[in-house]
Amino acid sequence: MTRLSALLLSTALCLPAHAQTPGIEKEELTLGFIKLTDMAPLAIAKEKGFFEDEGLSVTLVAQSNWKVLLDGVVSGELDGAHMLAGQPIAASIGYGTKAALVTPFSMDLNGNAITVSNAVWEEMKPNVPMADGKPVHPIKADALKPVIEAYADAGTPFNLGMVFPVSTHNYELRYWLAAGGINPGVYSPDDVSGQIGGEVLISVTPPPQMPATLEAGTILGYAVGEPWNQAAVAKGIGVPVITDADIWKNNPEKVFGLTAEFVDANPQTTLALTKALIRAAIWLDEGDNVNRAEAVEILARSEYVGADAAVIANSMTGTFEFEPGDKRPAPDFNVFFRYNATFPYYSDAVWTLTQMRRWGQIAEAKPDAWYDETAKSVYKPDIYKLAAEALIAEGKATADMFDFDADGYREPTSDFIDGVTYDGKAPNAYIDSLVIGLKGDQTVVGGEVTN
């Protein structure tokens, strides 16, 4: 047992009921976030007093983009932040920024979608099965493939946006395209555009700028979280064609990230933060999402997401609008606690690493053990379990809410749009089972894939 684990365990075992975490090393904290619906656990932990209950005084500060947010955490300007799941993983292996980051808490499942412009949607529609005058969902990228081919024949690039190179959005967009037989391109150490050999050109656009960039014609579609897909519908400029829950059911999305240095220096503060965030997640998913309407009003405020409440409510309250008049039930579009959403599973980290390898961000093949070791260096379920045990001891949660028997790996799943089975304990076999993308010992040299 590490010194940190021993210290946290002694604290958890000694906590009286209804007591804040004792021995807080740092009471005043500044946490960063991006203006997205899935920052909700942070806003709720603050507004419902869960941070305060733990003896924490928290200031939440919106960041302009994911790079600024990451730099803020690494520099210490921010004590922690709402992060893309891929950010602490990529930092740990030195892809982009090199830093030792960890996460004790997964912030949500699902929550993203892929939107295309109205013009592209009209070109896709003849290829989409219909029932009762409405598209049959999920819509596969097969329907987009002939559109992209027509653009290529005309010599016109097909530009798509995503929020960050190591974002779930990037990997979901690429997965969806590849499942439809479209090569999204690969990265190499010498070319980090991710466009080598691609039939589309995928680039970065900050989430709040997605609708305006689409409207300007700079991009023809994008993958992003809410409320920026529903905003395209509200503005009449685009059509979401698929949610990420239909690409991978109950996929991990954001995490709460901290530096390993912060956690080592502030173990009780880290425990307190994790407890408060778990309570916020429980509140968000309580009952049949009974608190979501209140959450929407909080998120709509300018200091948080700052979008129209009706737009945020489209996804947060159990529905999703694909086109005007085509609003469908989507009770699990945003999941904050159920299905063990907050548990930091190693297998979630491993999946991200497999996609980094698939698309060349990890330039060379790695053994299965490397994936396991890397995941365990970043994801910290031991802290999460201690926070959960403390909440149970305080009467703020019950044991049946948590997966205490988990070894850190979810069961293998085939809940992907292409039906391919993912087993986090066999990452190389999984990579090799995917038709498009690097596999085995393949590398990218001089813009060419070599064996």
Where are these regions (language model features)?
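N-terminal hydrophobic or amphipathic helices and topogenic motifs
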Residues: 20-59, 141-159, 326-451
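Repeat-unit-sized solenoid/scaffold elements
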Residues: 178-208, 236-254, 336-337, 343, ...
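Short alpha-helical interface patches
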Residues: 118-127, 262, 381-389
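Pocket-lining segment of extracytoplasmic ligand-binding domains
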Residues: 118, 207-320
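Secondary-structure end/capping motifs
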Residues: 264-382
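Soluble non-cytosolic domains of exported or imported proteins
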Residues: 36, 63-67, 82, 163-168, ...
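Gram-negative bacterial Sec-dependent N-terminal signal peptides
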Residues: 1-19
